[in-house]
């Protein structure tokens, strides 16, 4: 059989064994798919074709199919690495079902979410995936989404459940994420723990703050009405984390939980500017498990969002809507995971 050529035009040709290993199938099965002969299941065929894509090789002409349609993906600006991570999985999942993703990124001074949606509708998209959009802002008018439904445009929303919007939502358990971070710091001996999080009008920020108050009460016995003293609300950015950490350090906090990995990196910077060592003097926990945080100095302890599971579920719900199948217009909540690295350590008073 003739294996496909690489997309970059280089002469190297992939081994059948590489494709089979990537797809987790036998070489015989991979060969049947590449030669256009039926495989045992459609899902097997999709795995082999996805393996070709991941290895960077063009699909054989006979295996290509016309696009099933266009799906819009509306995201915030991509400076936060968690958003490109979500976008990549969503795009791969859509491509696996034959859809062509149309990425629409919001940038300062650029098109608004409403303007991007209007452009997508003009292009005749089959549906839209919203990632951390206006639906997560409790001060935004939710009627924009009701109007989408009235116009017959299927959509799904990732992060930021809003009970005023009737649509499938996919979210991480923000409260649980913060509780496990606080538990981790408490187990290391920390008793003065602070939270750096985004503005209260955003649902994920609000839920993280609620989880923080619950955790302080359950684990450290801190009255809920006192938890707010240990919360700083700012931007989900390095600069925001830097400012929040500076304030919490002045309060004597030895452990910080941050609402994003970028905020956590800002907290590390704030500690070092004050001559403090991370983690000897200050333990820091991020949120997201963004690409590269395992390689920062120190490697960042963080709470991992289940990006692949969430993005795949969002695509599945959207495709069910497009197919006019019954879809629960509710929130699908996914459990995060604590990833312990080098930015947290045992607290030794006076050490």
From Swiss-Prot:
Origin: domain of life: Bacteria
Residue span, HTH lacI-type domain: 14-69
DNA-binding feature ranges: 16-35
Sorted UniProt keywords: DNA-binding, Transcription, Transcription regulation
Coiled-coil positions: none
The keyword Transcription regulation is assigned to this record: yes
Pfam family, one: Peripla_BP_3
Role, per record: Putative sugar-binding regulatory protein for the alpha-amylase gene.
Protein name: Uncharacterized HTH-type transcriptional regulator in aml 5'region
Keyword Hydrolase: no
PROSITE patterns linked: HTH_LACI_1 (PS00356), HTH_LACI_2 (PS50932)
GO molecular function, one term: DNA-binding transcription factor activity
């Amino acid at each position: 059989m003739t294996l496909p050529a690489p997309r970059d035009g280089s002469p190297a040709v992939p081994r059948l064994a590489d494709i089979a290993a990537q797809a987790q199938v036998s070489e015989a099965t991979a060969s049947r798919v590449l030669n256009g002969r039926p495989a045992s299941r459609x899902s097997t065929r999709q795995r082999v074709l996805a393996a070709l894509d991941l290895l960077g090789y063009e699909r054989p002409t006979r295996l290509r199919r016309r696009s099933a349609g266009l799906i819009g993906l509306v995201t915030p600006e991509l400076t936060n690495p968690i958003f490109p991570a979500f976008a990549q999985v969503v795009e791969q999942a859509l491509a696996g079902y034959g859809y062509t993703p149309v990425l629409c990124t919001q940038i300062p001074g650029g098109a608004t979410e409403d303007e991007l949606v209007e452009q997508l509708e003009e292009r005749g998209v089959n549906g839209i995936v919203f990632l951390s959009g206006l639906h997560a802002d409790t001060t935004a008018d939710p009627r924009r989404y009701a109007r989408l439904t009235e116009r017959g445009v299927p959509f799904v929303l990732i992060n930021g459940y809003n009970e005023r919007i009737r649509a499938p939502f996919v979210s991480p358990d923000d409260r649980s994420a913060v509780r496990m971070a606080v538990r981790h710091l408490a187990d290391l001996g920390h008793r003065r723990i602070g939270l750096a999080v985004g503005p209260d009008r955003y649902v994920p920020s609000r839920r993280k703050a609620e989880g923080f108050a619950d955790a302080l009460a359950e684990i450290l016995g801190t009255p809920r009405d006192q938890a707010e003293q240990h919360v700083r609300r700012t931007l989900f950015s390095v600069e925001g984390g830097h400012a929040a950490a500076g304030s919490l350090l002045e309060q004597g906090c030895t452990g910080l939980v941050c609402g994003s990995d970028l905020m956590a990196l800002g907290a590390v910077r704030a500690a070092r500017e004050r001559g403090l060592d991370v983690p000897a003097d200050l333990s820091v926990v991020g949120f997201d498990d963004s690409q590269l945080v395992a390689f920062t100095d120190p490697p960042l302890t963080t709470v991992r969002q289940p990006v692949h599971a969430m993005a795949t579920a969002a695509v599945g719900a959207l495709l069910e809507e497009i197919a006019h199948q019954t879809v629960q217009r509710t929130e699908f909540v996914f459990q995060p995971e604590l990833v312990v690295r080098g930015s947290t350590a045992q607290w030794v008073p006076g050490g």
